[in-house]
Each structure stands twice: as C-alpha cells, then as structure tokens.
Regions:
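Subtilisin-like serine protease catalytic core
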Residues: 1-52, 66-71, 99, 124-128, ...
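Glycine-rich, charge-decorated loop segments at or immediately adjacent to ligand/cofactor-binding or catalytic sites
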Residues: 110-125
C-alpha cells in the first residue's frame, strides 16, 4: 500500500521468524514455515499505524487473496482503543477475512502491565487468533518461564484472549543493515567483548548511537 521504508523492520522480523529460510545461518535459524510464500503488505511509512491503515491492508488482502493465494495473515500491530467487534469496522473486516477462508493472526499487544490490560482490534475480533508473549529467559528450565507483558482478556465483548502463547523474546532474527538498530547492536557487541578499561573510550567514539549508553556514561564521570 506504501513504498517500503528501509528503516522500518518491525513487521519484517515476524515475517522472517515465521517463514525465513535461514540462508544467513546455513539453515540453522529457520522460520516455522520456511517453504511458505510471503506477500508483504506495507501499512504505512515511518511513524504511527492507524486503525484505518490496518483495515486498508486487510481489505487489500481480501481483494487480492486469489491472485496471490493468501491463506494466512499475520499482523504485528494493533489499534488505538478497546472497541466492540459488533461496531468496529476493523474487526468486521477481520470477520470478513475469516468468512473468506483467510486465517488472521495478530499480536495481542504489550499492555499487560496496565490495570485494564486492554486487548484492542484486530486481536480482539472473535475470529482473530491473538498471540500472547512468553519470556523463557533463554533457558530450557520451565521454572524460569514468565509472561512478557502481554495484554489479556476478557475483551470488551467478554472474549478470552489470547488464544496462543509463544516466545516473544530471545528469538534469533536478522537485523536490517545500516539502521539505528543495527548500529546499536554492533556497538553493544563491541562493548561486550571489550575489557573494562576500554568501555568509556568506545562509548565516547560512538556518541549518539545509543542515548541510554551516553546518559549512563555521563553519570559516571
């Protein structure tokens, strides 16, 4: 719907986790469905994604599902407020997708730390498979597992959400080169490998890449 912005990697990472072929790791880090064909639908340019943006994307999928053979839609975005699916246009489009044979999967949201832990559209739609997050602390020890601040129901319509819990952190995924995220990752790798007496010089040589590191270094002087 829009020209891709190379600085935006939020939706691309789930795509790779779902269907990546692991080419950068010789197949070691592959997605759950590496043989899948992926249709990338760009909802907006850099900045905020609105309910209307998501609705437009789903309507495009409905119109083009047969042309591209689309059977599953994954959405890594959510709306702005809790709304009943009976009156919410975005939720209604989710139901239309389901009626057309398209499975809609959506992140349930990151508001589990809020008092009302709201589940918003499209995840709150009855036919949407909402996915919550698990933090396994990068360990196979079940005792170390915990939730990752995911939103949860009941929804405003009394529906229990999410339907599925999946790992949401400690997942290997590629980072788009030459982006702020990639620069921060490279800097953190340097710091991790450096001896203590080299930490401040490295931070001083890379001012502006990670504001939190800059602020921490300033406080120590």
């Amino acid at each position: 719907l829009c020209q891709p912005d190379v600085a935006s990697w939020h939706g691309m990472i789930p795509s790779v986790v779902a269907a990546g072929n692991g080419s950068l790791s010789n197949g070691f880090y592959r997605g759950m469905a590496p043989d899948s064909d992926v249709v990338l639908v760009k909802l907006a340019r850099t900045g905020r994604i609105t309910d209307q943006n998501i609705q437009d994307g789903l309507e495009w999928v409905l119109e083009n599902r047969q042309k591209y053979g689309i059977k599953v839609v994954n959405i890594s975005a959510g709306g702005d407020e809790e709304l009943s699916y009976l009156h919410d246009p975005l939720s209604q489009v989710v139901e239309e997708c389901s009626a057309a044979g398209i499975t809609v999967v959506c992140a349930v949201g990151n508001a589990g730390h809020l008092p009302n832990h709201p589940v918003v559209p499209p995840a709150s739609a009855p036919s949407c498979i909402a996915v919550g997050g698990l933090d396994d602390n990068n360990s196979i020890n079940r005792a170390k597992r915990g939730m990752y601040r995911s939103s949860y129901g009941p929804t405003i319509d009394g529906l229990q959400k999410p339907e599925i819990i999946a790992s949401s952190i400690w997942i290997p995924a590629p980072i788009l080169p030459n982006t702020p995220t990639a620069q921060q990752a490279e800097l953190l790798e340097k710091l991790d490998k450096a001896p203590d007496d080299k930490l401040h010089p490295i931070i001083d040589a890379n001012v502006g890449i990670d504001p939190e590191l800059d602020a921490a270094a300033d406080r120590e002087f």
